[in-house]
Curated annotation (Swiss-Prot):
It is a peripheral membrane protein. This is NAD(P)H-quinone oxidoreductase subunit I, chloroplastic. Its main location: plastid. It comes from the Eukaryota. Residues 55-84, 95-124 form the 4Fe-4S ferredoxin-type domain. Binds 2 [4Fe-4S] clusters per subunit. Its EC number is 7.1.1.-. Gene3D superfamilies: 3.30.70.3270. GO terms for cellular component: chloroplast thylakoid membrane. The keyword Transport does not apply. NDH is composed of at least 16 different subunits, 5 of which are encoded in the nucleus. InterPro entries: 4Fe4S_Fe-S-bd, 4Fe4S_Fe_S_CS, NADH_quinone_OxRdtase_chainI, NDHI. The keyword Lipid metabolism does not apply.
Amino acid sequence: MFPMVTGFMNYGQQTVRAARYIGQSFMITLSHANRLPVTIQYPYEKLITSERFRGRIHFEFDKCIACEVCVRVCPIDLPVVDWKLETDIRKKRLLNYSIDFGICIFCGNCVEYCPTNCLSMTEEYELSTYDRHELNYNQIALGRLPMSVIGDYTIRTILNSTPIKKTAGNPLDSKTITNF
């Protein structure tokens, strides 16, 4: 054939292929147009954390036996445990317990290996501050109960604001809340 005709046929095929690709990408764009937004307005709306979320550590002073297992299993030897040996009853008495959340990696080993379950992970994740020394929590600050995101009336949680279809096979968890 003539080189001009074959060049024109290749040009026509390339034009049709390009139009098909543009049409496919436009259809994908249109299919995403009717979705709900994934982003939230953070200070006023908060996502509900999952059940196994590892937030701030909660400490119960009365349950602690000062065994220092939490210090031994911590990869960075973070919890500071001060205790005194009571010779008359031959037991340790806990004097001070503190964790610096500026250094903590929230691995959860201390919670997992605690024999008396005096440590637990909370859903509290807003630990930001202007002074890093305020992140060093003692037993009083660690014993404070966390503020519940669901119970705060000033914050609209995503659970209440979006329509959620609960299926019979899937239990309701944070993945069904955030995946629209």
